[in-house]
């Protein structure tokens, strides 16, 4: 039990985006970037020298840099090691005991590790909102848009998008900055978000929109 080995697959691009039901636009003063569970434990299942991990790392790094330039807060979620049976609860039935409390498992990968001032949430369930301060933080900052990237697309990323929607927060699900167990699961998450709870987009489209807003402001 645990995370299976994941075969390489092609990272979807703009040509693979499903049709969105909404046409929301990113506003720098409303948005927060969520970097979801980019811990070594979860990425060890991939071949780091092949897709989709190559693009995943590049695009999350790009999003983080561009958000930082514009004062958009960056929030990380990370699961703790050595979770007690009580804390882990039903997750154990599906995934086993989880990650050990060792840096080679719990640490966020170096390429996108948190900077001083970034928020790191201790995450206990699929959704980054469950048993964390994420909602309170968004509300305290007056922000109601969430840019979602990380792993895994059809599990925590998708459930976080659904939870955001149910809290009246607009989710922007970055198709080429999430990764999954397979191209089929990846596509399923994009189709669900676009038709039920948010906007699917790409890293380049997010950056383009941010630059456009910047140009208008200037």
Segment roles from a protein language model:
Residues 47-48, 87-91, 164:
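Surface-exposed, active-site-proximal loop segments in enzymatic domains
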Residues 67-86:
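Von Willebrand factor
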Residues 83-101:
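Acidic/polar short surface loop at catalytic or gating sites that assists cofactor/ion binding
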Residues 43, 85, 182:
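Conserved protein kinase catalytic core
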């Amino acid at each position: 039990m645990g995370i299976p080995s994941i075969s390489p697959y092609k990272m979807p691009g703009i040509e693979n985006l499903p049709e969105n039901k909404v046409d929301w636009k990113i506003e720098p003063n409303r948005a927060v970037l969520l970097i979801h569970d980019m811990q070594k434990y979860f990425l060890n299942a991939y071949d780091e020298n092949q897709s989709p991990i190559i693009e995943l790392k590049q695009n999350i790094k790009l999003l983080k840099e561009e958000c930082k330039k514009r004062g958009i807060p960056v929030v990380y979620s990370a699961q703790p090691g050595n979770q007690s049976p009580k804390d882990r609860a039903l997750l154990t039935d599906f995934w086993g005991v989880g990650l050990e409390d060792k840096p080679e498992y719990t640490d966020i990968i170096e390429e996108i590790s948190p900077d001083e001032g970034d928020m790191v949430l201790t995450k206990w369930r699929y959704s980054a909102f469950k048993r964390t301060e994420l909602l309170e933080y968004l509300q305290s900052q007056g922000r109601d848009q969430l840019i979602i990237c990380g792993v895994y697309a059809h599990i925590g990323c998708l459930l976080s998008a659904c939870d955001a929607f149910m809290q009246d927060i607009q989710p922007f699900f970055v198709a080429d900055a999430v990764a999954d167990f397979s191209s089929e699961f990846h596509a399923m998450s994009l189709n669900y978000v676009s038709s039920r709870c948010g906007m699917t987009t790409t890293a380049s489209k997010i950056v383009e929109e941010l630059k456009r807003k910047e140009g208008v402001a200037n």
